[in-house]
């Protein structure tokens, strides 16, 4: 697994032993300072503000939420599909898919998570992303009417499947390279890095208390299995960041469909024909209903 999915580890010492010793001592001797340092280190994404070539007609709009001002990107006319990127990503990754959606007679709206792209903020984590997403859904629904569906990439899948807005469970959902076994993989990655699990757990507990969102309730696979809306996963078998095996597990619910690819990796798949075709299937099914 990679920091590309969950949090920033680029500044970690190459020595796991020294890192573990240092963070444990820091937490013992100065717990408050250690937690602040850990929060800044672990929860600061790699901000990507390179949008690439914006499609003609793209409208940028700031949206104010309790988690700061988020930058949204709108393209097309018609019923709205909402798109969400993953950790250290940006809405610009969706430009090719947004163009395809707009060409099919829909409005595509993507946005930058807090502390990502052109949105405000310096740190991010799943409960913050969920709160911002839920508020954005409320605002988009009030302005444009009911959403037609949701598209999420990478950690965005875990965010979508942790939303407090249960009405989304009835909507079509396109998951691209999703992170589905979020909490075990998150803690496993911290352990493999050598960072103090006790210190990381202290940071997590503060976030849980602030947002009233215990990680014990985060279960993307379980939430996916309980949805009534059609869900399609597009996932590369050689994805180095999000396990393809978890997407295979997701199909055991008998309703979730999986489109497996090879050679598209974790990011290129966003602009691929299989992703476009999966959207076409979902939108056609939505129209038929």
Describe every region a protein language model picked out.
Residues 91, 98-120:
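Conserved alpha/beta-hydrolase
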Residues 151-160:
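Gly/Ala-rich beta-loop-alpha elbow adjacent to hydrolase catalytic centers
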Residues 264-274:
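Catalytic histidine-centered segment of alpha/beta-hydrolase-like enzymes
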Residues 123-143, 148:
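Alpha/beta-hydrolase active-site loop
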